Amino acid sequence: MLRFAPSPTGDMHIGNLRAAIFNYIVAKQQHKPFLIRIEDTDKERNIEGKDQEILEILKLMGMNWDKLVYQSHNIDYHREMAEKLLKENKAFYCYASVGFLEQEKEKAKNEKRPFRYLDEWAALEKNQHNTPVVRLKAPNHAVSFNDAIKKEVKFEPYELDSFVLLRKDKSPTYNFACACDDLLYEISLIIRGEDHVSNTPKQILIQQALGSNNPIIYAHLPIILDEASGKKMSKRDEASSVKWLLNQGFLPVAIVNYLITIGNKVPKEVFSLDEALEWFSLENLSNSPAHFNLKYLKHLNHQHLKRLDDEKLLELSQIKDRNLLGLLRLFIEECDTLLELKEKISLFLEPKDIVKTYENEDFKERCSILFNALKSMDFQAYKDFESFKKEAMRLSQLKGKDFFKPLRILLIGDSHGVELPLIFPYIQSHYQEILRLKA
């Protein structure tokens, strides 16, 4: 079984979605179940509703899961496993207070050495009023694993101390809950971000202590860097939020396409999730950081907009009039996102805002003259744009740019874009609706 294990503590990051996509693909390729595990044991950081938001995003991206679990529902199991380790003398109670440990950390900092917990501190503050934590005994050997992307990764004994499994309130730490649940659900492969590399030896030690004989294969994905700044894409970067990308009009299929592409060898530029199932391989992923380029994402999104079938295009653009399908196709040629497409359609159908495009009093006057001329015309009486244009020029006595710019503003709400002769058939059929001025 493969799993995606998000925490409901904020917006879904593109790095998390990338990991979800890869776990989903490999699960499908290997005909194994795909598990979603909501890691909600940190009650203080959980944000209400974020779990449902994560699940909704996964559905939008085309990923269906075979099983959904909440980590907090397994807390009794986590405590049972901690008790097992205590009984087998693989774990111990530690009474050292937070204050004492902070002092030792400060001392290590002043002495310019890494802080390392010492087992001899465990009973220093033992008394009936002091509630202990549970720690796993530090190993006296190195911990190594073969990463599917990073190859061999090794941690020496001095890099690992006796770390906490259960806090004072008997809640499990992240690493303990994660390791226990991966055993419980028989997870065979974990694909996740490289920020989890330091967690891996701890989780391996926990699973070994619990008697696991089926080592998990790990694949740690390199970080995603912003191509412009060269810095890691953090939660402060708008474009790192999947929710933000969706709100900006990026199609789910394009986001998936892009996240599979970066840092990867792909056989073609434009593809769907289902198509990627046929050729995706972890072996083709680079060990170097991936680079996020919003301009290229827009390019891919433009390609996927053009691939939309008629029904989906009408649905996403929220247009009910099928007669406007051709117009939508014309507008797509100059739009990179669904948001841009909706804005184009909105400018076309809604009352025209002369004030917004105001240049000077002369421009305002020309718009007024041309508007009155157009209102007197029956657009459907003209066989083509050329005959319509000649009559509009004659009635308004305007020509050149004094005619064409106001004409574009009055008819499509934009001084640039699709050529008027191409769009004229749609203007003819909707002229009474579009030839209106904003109050």
Swiss-Prot record:
One of its GO terms (molecular function) is tRNA binding. Its EC number is 6.1.1.17. ATP binds at residue 235. SUPFAM superfamilies: An anticodon-binding domain of class I aminoacyl-tRNA synthetases (SSF48163), Nucleotidylyl transferase (SSF52374). Coiled coil: none annotated. GO terms for biological process: glutamyl-tRNA aminoacylation. Keywords: Aminoacyl-tRNA synthetase, ATP-binding, Cytoplasm, Ligase, Nucleotide-binding, Protein biosynthesis. A motif ('KMSKS' region) lies at residues 232-236. It is found in: Cytoplasm. It comes from the Bacteria. A motif ('HIGH' region) lies at residues 6-16. GO terms for cellular component: cytosol. InterPro entries: aa-tRNA-synth_I_cd-bd (IPR045462), aa-tRNA-synth_I_codon-bd_sub2 (IPR020751), aa-tRNA-synth_I_CS (IPR001412), aa_tRNA-synth_I_cd-bd_sf (IPR008925), Glu-tRNA-ligase_bac/mito (IPR004527), Glu/Gln-tRNA-synth (IPR000924), Glu/Gln-tRNA-synth_Ib_cat-dom (IPR020058), GluQ/Sye (IPR049940). It catalyses: tRNA(Glu) + L-glutamate + ATP = L-glutamyl-tRNA(Glu) + AMP + diphosphate. Catalyzes the attachment of glutamate to tRNA(Glu) in a two-step reaction: glutamate is first activated by ATP to form Glu-AMP and then transferred to the acceptor end of tRNA(Glu). Monomer. PANTHER family: GLUTAMATE--TRNA LIGASE, GLUTAMATE--TRNA LIGASE, MITOCHONDRIAL-RELATED. Belongs to the class-I aminoacyl-tRNA synthetase family. Glutamate--tRNA ligase type 1 subfamily. This is Glutamate--tRNA ligase 1. The lineage of its organism: Bacteria, Pseudomonadati, Campylobacterota, Epsilonproteobacteria, Campylobacterales. The gene is gltX1.
